[in-house]
Amino acid sequence: KDGYPMVRAGREKGCKIWCVINNESCDSECKIRKGKKGYCYFWKLACYCEGLPANEQVWTYEKNTCKP
C-alpha cells in the first residue's frame, strides 16, 4: 500500500515523518518499513512511501493522533 509513514514512538508518535533532509532520507525510512520506495511529498513537508506491506500503519486524516 502507499501512504505517509508515521513516527512510531516518542513525542511525535502518530505524526507523519517530516522530510527535513532529502528524498534519500525518505527512501531509507520507507525501505526500513519494507516499502519499495519513498520520497518527499506535499511541498517537501512529509515522507511518502510506495509499496508498503498491508500491515504497515500509515497516517490518515481520520485517525490522526499527532499532537506535536
Curated annotation (Swiss-Prot):
Superkingdom of this protein's organism: Eukaryota
Domain spans labelled LCN-type CS-alpha/beta: 1-67
Location of this chain's protein in the cell: Secreted
GO molecular function: sodium channel inhibitor activity; toxin activity
A GO CC term attached to the entry: extracellular region
Classification via InterPro entries: LCN-type_CS_alpha_beta_dom, Scorpion_toxin-like, Scorpion_toxin-like_sf, Scorpion_toxinL, Scorpion_toxinL/defensin
GO biological process: defense response
Record keyword Secreted present: yes
Tissue: Expressed by the venom gland.
Main location per the UniProt record: secreted
PROSITE patterns to which the protein is assigned, alphabetical: LCN_CSAB
Free-text domain note: Has the structural arrangement of an alpha-helix connected to antiparallel beta-sheets by disulfide bonds (CS-alpha/beta).
Family: Belongs to the long (4 C-C) scorpion toxin superfamily. Sodium channel inhibitor family. Beta subfamily.
Name the UniProt record assigns to this protein: Beta-toxin Im-2
Organism expressing this protein natively: Isometrus maculatus
UniProt lineage: Eukaryota, Metazoa, Ecdysozoa, Arthropoda, Chelicerata
